[in-house]
Amino acid sequence: MTLRSKMTKYIFVTGGVVSGLGKGVSAASIGNLLKHRGFKIFVLKLDPYLNIDPGVMSPYEHGEVYVTADGGETDLDLGHYERFIDVELSKDSNYTSGKIFSNLFTQERNGNFLGKTVQLIPHFTNEILNTIEKIATKHKPDFMIVEIGGTIGDIESNSFIYAMAELALAKPDRFFLVHVTYVIFLEASNEFKSKPTQVSINSLRSFGISPNLVLLRNSKMVPDNIVEKIAKKSVLNKDYVISVPDMKNIYEAPLYFESQNIAQIILSHFKIKDIEPDLSKWNKLVDSIKKPKAYKAKILMVGKYVEFLDAYKSIIEAFKVSSYEENIDLKMDWVDSSKLELTNLDEFLKGYDGVVILPGFGIRGWEQKVRIAQYTRENKIPTFGICLGFQAMSVAHARMKGIKNANSREFANDKNDETYILDLIQGKAKDKNLGGTLRLGNYTTTIKENTLAKKIYQKDQVIERHRHRYEINSKYIDLLEDEEFVFSGIWNEGKLAEICEVKNHPFYLGVQYHPEFTSRPLKPNPLFTSFLRVLIKNN
């Protein structure tokens, strides 16, 4: 079933009371159910902050930067969208106030406004609407899900809410609003309080707009009397006010939404006949999550931003979905590499089945990553390196080969005795700005025969997503390779090393790219799955 001959329908998702309610998972779950009904889905995240994109934001501020196939540096919610909906999104899927303002200022400098005073209303709000409509025209989805970041009442969100209200007024038959809000529970009095949710909905009404569907978030089910109270105060049918409790696993959300007839409510609003979705594969996924596991594995995640695990959100999800597929009870322990005690690694690593050396930027903890890469190689501990992890494994190998001061130019010091086996990618040396100057998005890697990488991928070429500025200096590739160590994946166009591995080792493989961005709940990336298989085989 498809609506491609019709105009795109817009489903907006907003949040109320507090942030971090799961708007992204809610939007992704709605997209999942509509996709399972045969509709074409596109998702847009509108973020009110003034950064052009999250590319140079601290992981502690924003979590991971999710990279799209076309090289967009975007919000981590896009990871939820791609994983839940199994759709490849693009740079068009994330716009910030900063990005929209930048476009607006360019137009102003070009004289497009004919000397008029440029204001938030109507010029900025018009630019928001133009952005939404251009994307809809370009991608031609049946449904375009638009998540607005932040919460209702935030000053920085007001222009987006105003623009949304304008769109609702202009296209009422193509507009649907889902409001995700938090219902407070007071432990002291053992009761739910609905007033903040009512205020949130009233704030929407002050813009001339009412939600079509309200999702009530809490760790537990919101009782019927509170649901009825909120529905009455919101002038909504009780069936359109739905309690959404915390779930043991986020992948249960689409099935819960289906049980609450959320897709039916949306389709009924647009006067579209519902069809029965085939959710058998998703049901099987959730069953695999819930069932008792046949195996156990424990891995050490060696990172840099471990105090805020959203910095590694896609890696965590990639390992989880692979563990579900392999029926493994997986435990991930996290350590800040800069705090590693290198003098007692024997004792520290005891009890771990494998080690993952994680991505990151900056010198803090770099030497410890190199040392642990050398230790796990020498002691035959299964090791998987991603991005900076690949670089640490390569530098460790170079030093083991006798290149005593092998290093990356990223971490150059004032000494003249270092050998930079990792250097700026050609063409990046002259870039003065940090933002948008990395090697980003999809690139094709050619895999060598008779290697672990070939055994894992079962392909001659693979396409994976990249986000880095430094690569193995091509003049050192032949020097570093030997009977034990091989660069098993190469980007032929620029002779860039993309995969390294060690023979005669249970598993010692690093990748310059980010395989976590192509892992899906129903199609796990084989690198994560293969790594876990080795762990349970060793056990």
UniProtKB/Swiss-Prot annotation:
Amino acids binding ATP: G20, L21, G22, K23, G24, V25, D77
Binding positions for UTP per the UniProt entry: S19, K193, S194, K195, P196, T197, Q198, K229
Pathway(s) the chain acts in: Pyrimidine metabolism; CTP biosynthesis via de novo pathway; CTP from UDP: step 2/2
Coiled-coil features, chain-numbered ranges: none
Glutamine amidotransferase type-1 domain mapped to chain residues: 298-539
Annotated keywords: ATP-binding, Glutamine amidotransferase, Ligase, Magnesium, Metal-binding, Nucleotide-binding, Pyrimidine biosynthesis
Any one Gene Ontology BP term: pyrimidine nucleobase biosynthetic process
UniProt note on regulation of activity: Allosterically activated by GTP, when glutamine is the substrate; GTP has no effect on the reaction when ammonia is the substrate. The allosteric effector GTP functions by stabilizing the protein conformation that binds the tetrahedral intermediate(s) formed during glutamine hydrolysis. Inhibited by the product CTP, via allosteric rather than competitive inhibition.
Function recorded in the entry: Catalyzes the ATP-dependent amination of UTP to CTP with either L-glutamine or ammonia as the source of nitrogen. Regulates intracellular CTP levels through interactions with the four ribonucleotide triphosphates.
UniProt-listed PANTHER family: CTP SYNTHASE, CTP SYNTHASE-RELATED
Listed name of the protein: CTP synthase
Gene name, Swiss-Prot/TrEMBL: pyrG
